[in-house]
């Protein structure tokens, strides 16, 4: 069994459902220390974070990943135990195989190989891991970034091991992500009998024109390689369950995925103004998950495009699609950020898996990226 495959299996066997780490980072730190890395454990709240560095000074290249996984769901739905890694027909199955214990294992192996071959490399190679990526992401990289700001820690380049490939390893290079902003709108009315609407105020009827305007609005036409900003209603609830009662309150949850054309305060102001025009009696709670980030043409992007093209046999698609990642907390530090990882077809699903051949190729891919950035 190859080194990366063995380490991936060891990590999968640790049931690190967010925010638990289940000893993953301790095992990784032991290996990185043996390779000459300095390791710092940053426990913030209930979350484990690991900051490991080799070398000194600029440029600083960070390999960013997470050791937590989403819950497996009903175990009887899996072909095999989600935390008992199994290889069948050249495919490794287990929770976290693709998202993202395979990438984390590949980071470790690539880092070990790189510093063994280039012990006096230029700049700093760092590995940053958290156990709070799949959950609320409050005490993970978000908090670590605050610590870095206080210390004056700079980062030049960041490679996140998120499963970015679509069909074959290296066919997509993630160069940015949209921002994410969620809102919970509560519209107040007056409860009453449906036969006497004049004695009540139906919050569904009152809010309907405003909601229609919200969902019909075209926020922008996209930005660079970003798709247009999108607002989606995700949950609507009102009423007691009885069909003869006008509800006294309506609650609507919604989410915006937005381009760098916007920021969260401007979007919040726009939506508040729209609701005010409709003279609603309402409250609105916001949750800012992260601002958008975008890595323009530069050394990191050009090197990654070149390396992925070599490994995949064709230039990668360069995309800003998908959800959010922890790179959104590193980019504001001034870092150029990209995401490179295995095929994402099975992430968060029953029988999550990664092709063994892809997993075994990942360390060489990451090591090549590191060498072209830190070896002059």
Swiss-Prot record:
<keyword id="KW-0457">Lysine biosynthesis</keyword>
<keyword id="KW-0170">Cobalt</keyword>
<feature type="active site">
    <location>
        <position position="68"/>
    </location>
</feature>
<dbReference type="GO" id="GO:0050897">
    <property type="term" value="F:cobalt ion binding"/>
</dbReference>
<dbReference type="InterPro" id="IPR036264">
    <property type="entry name" value="Bact_exopeptidase_dim_dom"/>
</dbReference>
<dbReference type="InterPro" id="IPR050072">
    <property type="entry name" value="Peptidase_M20A"/>
</dbReference>
<dbReference type="GO" id="GO:0008777">
    <property type="term" value="F:acetylornithine deacetylase activity"/>
</dbReference>
<dbReference type="GO" id="GO:0009089">
    <property type="term" value="P:lysine biosynthetic process via diaminopimelate"/>
</dbReference>
<dbReference type="GO" id="GO:0006526">
    <property type="term" value="P:L-arginine biosynthetic process"/>
</dbReference>
<feature type="binding site">
    <location>
        <position position="348"/>
    </location>
    <ligand>
        <name>Zn(2+) 2</name>
    </ligand>
</feature>
<dbReference type="InterPro" id="IPR011650">
    <property type="entry name" value="Peptidase_M20_dimer"/>
</dbReference>
<comment type="function">
    <text>Catalyzes the hydrolysis of N-succinyl-L,L-diaminopimelic acid (SDAP), forming succinate and LL-2,6-diaminopimelate (DAP), an intermediate involved in the bacterial biosynthesis of lysine and meso-diaminopimelic acid, an essential component of bacterial cell walls.</text>
</comment>
<dbReference type="Pfam" id="PF07687">
    <property type="entry name" value="M20_dimer"/>
</dbReference>
<feature type="binding site">
    <location>
        <position position="99"/>
    </location>
    <ligand>
        <name>Zn(2+) 1</name>
    </ligand>
</feature>
<feature type="active site" description="Proton acceptor">
    <location>
        <position position="133"/>
    </location>
</feature>
<feature type="binding site">
    <location>
        <position position="99"/>
    </location>
    <ligand>
        <name>Zn(2+) 2</name>
    </ligand>
</feature>
<dbReference type="GO" id="GO:0019877">
    <property type="term" value="P:diaminopimelate biosynthetic process"/>
</dbReference>
<protein>
    <recommendedName>
        <fullName>Succinyl-diaminopimelate desuccinylase</fullName>
        <ecNumber>3.5.1.18</ecNumber>
    </recommendedName>
</protein>
<dbReference type="GO" id="GO:0009014">
    <property type="term" value="F:succinyl-diaminopimelate desuccinylase activity"/>
</dbReference>
<dbReference type="InterPro" id="IPR002933">
    <property type="entry name" value="Peptidase_M20"/>
</dbReference>
<comment type="subunit">
    <text>Homodimer.</text>
</comment>
<comment type="pathway">
    <text>Amino-acid biosynthesis; L-lysine biosynthesis via DAP pathway; LL-2,6-diaminopimelate from (S)-tetrahydrodipicolinate (succinylase route): step 3/3.</text>
</comment>
<keyword id="KW-0862">Zinc</keyword>
<feature type="binding site">
    <location>
        <position position="66"/>
    </location>
    <ligand>
        <name>Zn(2+) 1</name>
    </ligand>
</feature>
<dbReference type="InterPro" id="IPR005941">
    <property type="entry name" value="DapE_proteobac"/>
</dbReference>
<feature type="binding site">
    <location>
        <position position="134"/>
    </location>
    <ligand>
        <name>Zn(2+) 2</name>
    </ligand>
</feature>
<dbReference type="GO" id="GO:0008270">
    <property type="term" value="F:zinc ion binding"/>
</dbReference>
<keyword id="KW-0378">Hydrolase</keyword>
<dbReference type="InterPro" id="IPR001261">
    <property type="entry name" value="ArgE/DapE_CS"/>
</dbReference>
<keyword id="KW-0220">Diaminopimelate biosynthesis</keyword>
<keyword id="KW-0028">Amino-acid biosynthesis</keyword>
<keyword id="KW-0479">Metal-binding</keyword>
<comment type="similarity">
    <text>Belongs to the peptidase M20A family. DapE subfamily.</text>
</comment>
<feature type="binding site">
    <location>
        <position position="162"/>
    </location>
    <ligand>
        <name>Zn(2+) 1</name>
    </ligand>
</feature>
<dbReference type="Pfam" id="PF01546">
    <property type="entry name" value="Peptidase_M20"/>
</dbReference>
